[in-house]
Amino acid sequence: MLDNTRLRIAIQKSGRLSDDSRELLARCGIKINLHTQRLIAMAENMPIDILRVRDDDIPGLVMDGVVDLGIIGENVLEEELLNRRAQGEDPRYLTLRRLDFGGCRLSLATPVDEAWDGPAALDGKRIATSYPHLLKRYLDQKGVSFKSCLLNGSVEVAPRAGLADAICDLVSTGATLEANGLREVEVIYRSKACLIQRDGEMAQSKQELIDKLLTRIQGVIQARESKYIMMHAPSERLEEVIALLPGAERPTILPLAGEQQRVAMHMVSSETLFWETMEKLKALGASSILVLPIEKMME
């Protein structure tokens, strides 16, 4: 039995978002053993319970108020939202923030030897998918009628098996499509993981914990997107050097022992530092350039 005084978070037990979700919670300082087969794991250092479930179940658990938070792909969330609306329900939830993992796209794909001149080419065709509501919404907007073939897995084999003329499925690299004689022809939905919260009144202690968790998540994401940079640079070219490195704040400038014309510069850059940027820094006279990852960050 779940304790209602503890914050309940649902994550995917196994699959595309599972490892990244667990890593995010760990980097937020939540100490929990997620290597067992138990469906409910209790945090050691916070009043938090983690429910490990199928990703399809997470939106419903949040919308029905069974859990307080859920980490889920936007594609699964939107499909469940459309499904419930089609049944006359009025599902409610709050999207707290988009996360920095789980990126994918839901796309239409057809056999490589078939011509494609837009969605109209699918009029009257049979399309295999695990996302019937997202597919219907998209093709309804295009004025295309079709027959849906609902599959919960191995969607890409449907055309070869004679089950469908085309498919609508998640794509990351496109290698699976190519292996099955298909080509991606149209992206209908782009998705990333997101953090959602149940609608309705929340106990103050839980809300304070959610606010703390959001601050930590923001810090984790900022840290992943930032780098700590150290270098020696000529004093007269500091502004040119800084212009190459967009940062959260102005850099720290320190004198160099025995050097009158050069200084040490430390800063956090909010953009990826490419080799081309480092070469430009060197051309401006910078030396001893170090680029380091950041584990945690709070502004």
Curated annotation (Swiss-Prot):
Requisite cofactors: Mg(2+)
Catalytic activity from the UniProt record: 1-(5-phospho-beta-D-ribosyl)-ATP + diphosphate = 5-phospho-alpha-D-ribose 1-diphosphate + ATP
Keyword ATP-binding among record annotations: yes
Residue pairs linked by disulfide bridges in the UniProt entry: none
Compartments where found: Cytoplasm
EC number: 2.4.2.17
Induction: Repressed by ppGpp in the presence of histidine.
Activity regulation (UniProt): Feedback inhibited by histidine. Also inhibited by AMP and ADP.
Top-level EC class as recorded in UniProt: transferase
Alphabetized UniProt keyword annotations: Amino-acid biosynthesis, ATP-binding, Cytoplasm, Glycosyltransferase, Histidine biosynthesis, Magnesium, Metal-binding, Nucleotide-binding, Transferase
Cellular-component GO terms for this entry: cytoplasm
GO terms assigned for molecular function: ATP binding; ATP phosphoribosyltransferase activity; magnesium ion binding
Pathway where it operates: Amino-acid biosynthesis; L-histidine biosynthesis; L-histidine from 5-phospho-alpha-D-ribose 1-diphosphate: step 1/9
UniProt main location, coarse: cytoplasm
InterPro entries attached to this UniProt entry: ATP-PRT_HisG_long (IPR020621), ATP_PRibTrfase_cat (IPR013820), ATP_PRibTrfase_CS (IPR018198), ATP_PRibTrfase_HisG (IPR001348), HisG_C (IPR013115), N-reg_PII-like_a/b (IPR011322), N-reg_PII/ATP_PRibTrfase_C (IPR015867)
GO BP of this protein: L-histidine biosynthetic process
A Pfam family the protein falls into: HisG_C
Function noted in UniProt: Catalyzes the condensation of ATP and 5-phosphoribose 1-diphosphate to form N'-(5'-phosphoribosyl)-ATP (PR-ATP). Has a crucial role in the pathway because the rate of histidine biosynthesis seems to be controlled primarily by regulation of HisG enzymatic activity.
Family: Belongs to the ATP phosphoribosyltransferase family. Long subfamily.
Subunit composition and interactions: Equilibrium between an active dimeric form, an inactive hexameric form and higher aggregates. Interconversion between the various forms is largely reversible and is influenced by the natural substrates and inhibitors of the enzyme.
Protein name, entry field: ATP phosphoribosyltransferase
Lineage: Bacteria, Pseudomonadati, Pseudomonadota, Gammaproteobacteria, Enterobacterales
Gene: hisG
